[in-house]
Amino acid sequence: MTSRRVSSRRKSRTNKSLFISLLLLFNFDSLVSESSGTESLIDKDKILNSMDWLENQDFDWYKANVPFLETPDKEIDATYYYRWELVTRHICYGSPNSGYLLTEFANRPFWSGAYGAIACPSGHQFYEIRWMHNPHVARDYLRYWFRTKGAQPRKYSSWLADSAWAVHQVHPNEQFILDLFPDLLKNFQGWEERHWVKEMNMFWQTGHDDGMEFNINSRQTKDILRGDRAFRPTFNSYMWADATALAKIAALKKDRKLE
């Protein structure tokens, strides 16, 4: 009986975490949109004061930057605002030339790029920060990958074109995304040149560079950290997402060859 209860609690936590992820992944304007009047019904101070365990107590930042959410489930609410607290821990201002970016590790390990950014989590980060009221951070971070010396957009798997399109869906700005298009296209072509296998119609990637070091595949090779080349479903799905996003952006600029 005890094991069933533990299993049920774990399943409940998993479902709640999945709910938060889906909330940030898809459009949830109907729940949090200020324009619809929903957010005005939420007592922001009351919610934030109930989150006294948050390490970042700069409540003015939350009120100025993020959509507010209130549900009947306090665990979902706590998870949601904790996710935003994590964003505050990793937003970094690199320089006047690079602007804002996000780090993966607070201590900026040696394998990170300029100012501590790493491409591996970038797609997840973009899908969260795109919901900030002001798109300034997301747009700086997109530009960072292509216009900052020392950025490493292809050191790890990422889906930067899809991320750019995702930001555009929340904060439409054709001028910005069309200006970024040549960089996004060049980045995709860089992956093609190095990883595309024409005979298989697929991209190869190693587990380490796919953000999954020391995996079951790599442990069957001599290099247990990196592993061997493989046609990984993850990486191929990222490339498909980027190709789809590039086609959508090409349609905006009426580029029939790339659309």
Q: PLM features: residue spans?
A:
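Active-site neighborhood of glycoside hydrolase catalytic domains
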Residues: P233-E259
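Bacterial N-terminal signal peptides
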Residues: I20-D29
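N-terminal secretory signal peptides that target proteins for export/translocation
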Residues: M1-T14
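Aromatic-lined, polymer-binding surfaces characteristic
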Residues: I118, W131, P135-A138, R147-Q169, ...
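Active-site acid/base region of carbohydrate-active enzymes
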Residues: E70-P96, Y115, A119-C120, V170-T234, ...
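Low-complexity, Ser/Thr/Pro/Gly-enriched N-terminal "stalk/linker" regions
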Residues: E34-A117
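Solvent-exposed loop and edge beta-strand segments that line ligand/cofactor-binding
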Residues: G37, M51-L54, F68, E104-A119, ...
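Alpha-helical support elements that line or immediately flank enzyme active sites
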Residues: N107-L142
